[in-house]
């Protein structure tokens, strides 16, 4: 019986901790959500521009190398 409890107890503890975590978590309010969304959009835009300019620079360099 002790061996069974040794296997069951970690699962029970994990379930208890998980339930406590979910109860403690709260959804962000509108202001916080908009702040996160704007920051994410700015990050996407910056990464897009970086990728665009890298591609813009590498196309002529690639044409010079391959065109020779």
Curated annotation (Swiss-Prot):
Cytoplasmic side stretches: 1-32
Extracellular side, ranges: 62-68
Keyword Protein transport in record: yes
A Pfam family: SecE
UniProt KW keywords: Endoplasmic reticulum, Membrane, Protein transport, Translocation, Transmembrane, Transmembrane helix, Transport
Superkingdom as given in the UniProt entry: Eukaryota
Gene Ontology MF term list: protein transmembrane transporter activity; ribosome binding
The keyword Transport belongs to this UniProt entry's keyword annotation: yes
Transmembrane intervals: 33-61
Biological-process GO terms, alphabetical: post-translational protein targeting to membrane, translocation
A GO cellular component entry from the record: Ssh1 translocon complex
Topological category with respect to the lipid bilayer: Single-pass membrane protein
Subcellular location: Endoplasmic reticulum membrane
Subunit structure: Heterotrimeric complex composed of SEC61-alpha, SEC61-beta and SEC61-gamma. Component of the ribosome-associated ER translocon complex.
Record-stated family: Belongs to the SecE/SEC61-gamma family.
Role played: Necessary for protein translocation in the endoplasmic reticulum and multi-pass membrane protein biogenesis.
HAMAP family for the chain: SecE (MF_00422)
Protein's name according to its UniProt entry: Protein transport protein Sec61 subunit gamma
Organism, as annotated: Ciona intestinalis
Gene: SEC61G
């Amino acid at each position: 019986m002790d061996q069974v409890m040794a296997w069951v107890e970690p699962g029970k503890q994990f379930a208890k901790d998980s339930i406590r975590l979910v109860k403690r978590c709260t959804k962000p309010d509108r202001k916080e959500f908009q702040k996160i969304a704007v920051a994410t959009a700015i990050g996407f835009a910056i990464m897009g521009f970086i990728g665009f300019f890298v591609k813009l620079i590498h196309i002529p360099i690639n044409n010079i190398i391959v065109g020779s």
